[in-house]
Amino acid sequence: MNILQNLKKSDPVISNFINSEKNRQETHLELIASENFASIAVMQAQGSVLTNKYAEGLPQKRYYGGCEFVDEIEELAIQRAKKLFNANWANVQPHSGAQANAAVFLSLLQPGDTIMGMDLSHGGHLTHGSPVNMSGKWFNAVHYGVNKETSELNFDEIREIALETKPKLIICGYSAYPRTIDFESFRNIADEVGAFLMADIAHIAGLVASKLHPNPLPYCDVVTTTTHKTLRGPRGGLILCKDGEFGKKFDKSVFPGTQGGPLEHIIAAKAVAFGEALQPDFVNYSQQVIKNAKVLASTLISRGIDIVSGGTDNHIVLLDLRSINMTGKIADLLVSAVNITANKNTVPFDPESPFVTSGLRLGTAALTTRGFNETAFAEVGEIIADRLLNPNDSVIESQCKDKVLALCNRFPLYEGKLEASIK
């Protein structure tokens, strides 16, 4: 029996919601920068009998019996992660990027220690010291931002803040920063103030794996990431380290420090994704992600819409909508009405609240997986510009939606193979 047919019989309500979500993904242009489309193989691993197995501990050091096969799977995931990022140690158990970060904090910090990360409104992340997050409640968080003129990192200012505040941990890596990160400069500052250096590469992990962005491991004490986004795996976390002995501290902070049993079905899916990312085709994919982002940015700029920092080096294109006198909240609603999913986002020195914002964040990873090339992304850019520059024109709204649906038909999600894979 088809798996989804079985679900439809046992729980038709959930089955209908899943089918509705599948239809939404097929008929919308996914431009949320933190999303991607995992392969059918990754999803099959997630939906396997491994979901039944409890396996507290590390491979060969479990607290439960019957772990011989999940040990093999987890060891393979670790080996592939180490090879992919040229690391000497890896822990594949974190359930998310946020939990990977929490495990690092538990290993390196005491409550009240000073941590230093990018201001959330400039492109940082909640887990880098935001006052609404554990990282900002348990630790003394100080923040750096970007240069007001260039919207790029200002290392002179970062050094000044570090010298003044003497953080125990400096965090680099961001959720809305479209430029290359100079990890070596961060290392120099960390050494000067005696701080640990952590890189959170959740957004750029796939580009790092493809050697299209500098690898932080030669410079950072520890690296965390998610396994979805540009890495195109299941939703999960990963911790990497260049020093195997140092890495053992993080093993203990994952389990029993912050988690119980690992999700072995997700770890299997991570192993599959790491294996996919080790193939030459993945480098081609990552190259296309960047090419597409540059075309998307240049198309929008040509229509009079400002892009934060004037362009992009990765998959992120961050629109500064002050250039067209619009808020991110309104822009999000406008593109959503024509089947484009994105997210409102603060821009550096944003006068609006986080619930309104002056920015719209776009990303090219998901549609590149779907097969979109530069020509297609030029079309996407024109559609977005048409919609944002004509917010009250119902005719243009209808035309934009028709163009979106035509693109979805030209680049079908999973090329129609999804149904066949789950029989």
Curated annotation (Swiss-Prot):
Its cofactor is pyridoxal 5'-phosphate. Its main location: cytoplasm. It catalyses: (6R)-5,10-methylene-5,6,7,8-tetrahydrofolate + glycine + H2O = (6S)-5,6,7,8-tetrahydrofolate + L-serine. GO terms for molecular function: glycine hydroxymethyltransferase activity; pyridoxal phosphate binding. Disulfide bonds: none annotated. Keywords: Amino-acid biosynthesis, Cytoplasm, One-carbon metabolism, Pyridoxal phosphate, Transferase. The modification N6-(pyridoxal phosphate)lysine is found at residue 229. GO terms for biological process: glycine biosynthetic process from serine; tetrahydrofolate interconversion. It is found in: Cytoplasm. Its EC number is 2.1.2.1. GO terms for cellular component: cytosol. It is an enzyme of class 2 (transferase). It holds the Pfam family SHMT. InterPro entries: PyrdxlP-dep_Trfase, PyrdxlP-dep_Trfase_major, PyrdxlP-dep_Trfase_small, Ser_HO-MeTrfase, Ser_HO-MeTrfase-like, Ser_HO-MeTrfase_PLP_BS, SHMT-like_dom. (6S)-5,6,7,8-tetrahydrofolate binds at residues 120, 124-126, 245, 353-355. Pathway: One-carbon metabolism; tetrahydrofolate interconversion; Amino-acid biosynthesis; glycine biosynthesis; glycine from L-serine: step 1/1. The keyword Protein biosynthesis does not apply. The record marks 228 as: Plays an important role in substrate specificity. Homodimer. Catalyzes the reversible interconversion of serine and glycine with tetrahydrofolate (THF) serving as the one-carbon carrier. This reaction serves as the major source of one-carbon groups required for the biosynthesis of purines, thymidylate, methionine, and other important biomolecules. Also exhibits THF-independent aldolase activity toward beta-hydroxyamino acids, producing glycine and aldehydes, via a retro-aldol mechanism. Belongs to the SHMT family. This is Serine hydroxymethyltransferase. It comes from Prochlorococcus marinus (strain MIT 9312). The gene is glyA.
